[in-house]
Amino acid sequence: MKKILERLFNHSYLSYEESKKILKEISSNKYNDSQVASFLTIFKMRNPSVQEIEGFRDALLDLCIKIDLGSDFETIDLCGTGGDGKNTFNISTISSFVVAGAGYKVTKHGNYGVSSNCGSSDVLEYLGVRLSNDQDYLKKCLDVGGFCYLHAPLFHPAMKNVASVRKDL
């Protein structure tokens, strides 16, 4: 990690392969919190390249728990940005209700608030929604209400290793 951090500190970018590999290594707890915090801080200071985003995305797709909601549903995800840092209300969750109410199928993806007071999971738990990764339950939610929720920790358990660092940052 030290070599990667040194390169990034010198304004270099990671290749697709490096990005994918390092995210998988971070998720397997290969690095300490200081190294992970340094790595994450770099991406708060500069925008990632297309190759970095693609590598991170593909690593997350490889590591995630997959479900099949069937071909009966074409859904849209109205995932928010993860907090605006201004403690405004959770717009993406409310938007999901509006879109589902208009007749579209919504598969919302989100988490508890990290950089704000109120993430999508906070809102939905408060409203009594059961957070689940049970495929049959999620299909029923879509079928009956036009809305189902994918609580990120249930679908991306590998990211638990960075949760406390993200919260601290």
What are these regions (language model features)?
Residues 74-77, 104-107, 122, 146-153:
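Structural motif
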Residues 137-169:
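Phosphate/diphosphate-binding glycine-rich loops and adjacent basic-rich segments that engage nucleotide
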Residues 25, 42-45, 117-127, 133-136, ...:
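Short, structured segments at the rim of ligand-binding sites
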Residues 80, 84-140:
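A generic, well-ordered mixed alpha/beta core segment in the N-terminal half of proteins
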Residues 67, 71, 127, 151-153:
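Short alpha-helix boundary/capping motifs
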Residues 1-88, 102, 106:
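Acidic, glycine/proline-rich low-complexity segments that act as flexible tails and inter-domain linkers
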